[in-house]
Amino acid sequence: VITVNNYTGAAAQAVTLPAATVGTIVVHAQSDDSTGGTNTLTFTCAGNDVYRTGSKVESRAAGAVQTIDTSAANETILTYTPANAATNSLTHGTYLYFTCFEKGIWNFAYDLATGNTADTGAAAWS
């Protein structure tokens, strides 16, 4: 499943992933710039599904060194919070990948903006 999404941060957006069935792939293709506000974008696992323990996601704060958040056991939500600026790491042409290799468990990967000005956007597991 590839979802082209025009999330801008102007309104909160909640996405529930499909059931984590072996072979399922979900791609979030970001089609717009997330410069419209600071409302969150969340990806929640369905039912009893979880993110793989030890999954990594990059988080950035303006003027600060980027950090990596690591998922703990039984976490089910990935939250992205943009800055109200044109400097977010989730912008035109970036992708979030959710892949299932083991029933009930989502693996996560990402291709975020990497330029010098893409230095905002907080991401965290819960």
Short names for language-model regions:
Residues 74-85:
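A conserved acidic, glycine/proline-rich C-terminal tail/linker
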Residues 92-100:
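Extracellular disulfide-bonded cysteine-rich modules/repeats
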Residues 89:
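Binuclear metal-ion centers of metallo-dependent hydrolases, dominated by the metallo-beta-lactamase
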